[in-house]
């Protein structure tokens, strides 16, 4: 069942990526800029959301609460 779910989600992402790239080349630079700004943003303050890839300012993420520690 897990394998089927992963395959389904992968197919959805591929379909979404394909349809969003059709006929929208003029917005390509804008999407690239948005992605770069997300990659270069600062750390997440205490109490902010964190997950598998935590970027907490305190370098500590409470995984059970999904928030950055103080």
Swiss-Prot record:
Signal peptide: 1-17
Cellular component terms (Gene Ontology): extracellular region
Annotated propeptide span(s): 18-41
Family membership noted in the UniProt record: Belongs to the conotoxin O1 superfamily.
Stretch list, region Disordered: 19-41
Subcellular location: Secreted
Domains: entry comment: The presence of a 'disulfide through disulfide knot' structurally defines this protein as a knottin.
Tissues expressing this chain: Expressed by the venom duct.
Database matches in InterPro entries: Conotoxin
Pfam families per the UniProt record, alphabetical: Conotoxin (PF02950)
GO molecular function: ion channel inhibitor activity; toxin activity
Keywords assigned by UniProt, alphabetized: Disulfide bond, Knottin, Secreted, Signal, Toxin
Predominant location category: secreted
Record bears the keyword Oxidoreductase: no
Name of the molecule in the record: Conotoxin AbVIC
Disulphide connectivity of cysteines: 43-57, 50-61, 56-68
């Amino acid at each position: 069942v897990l394998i089927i779910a992963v395959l389904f989600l992968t197919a959805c992402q591929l379909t979404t990526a394909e349809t969003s790239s059709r006929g929208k080349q003029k917005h390509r630079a804008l999407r690239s800029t948005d992605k770069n700004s997300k990659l270069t943003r600062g750390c997440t303050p205490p109490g902010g959301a964190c997950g598998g890839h935590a970027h907490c300012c305190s370098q500590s993420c409470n995984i059970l609460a999904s928030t950055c520690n103080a």
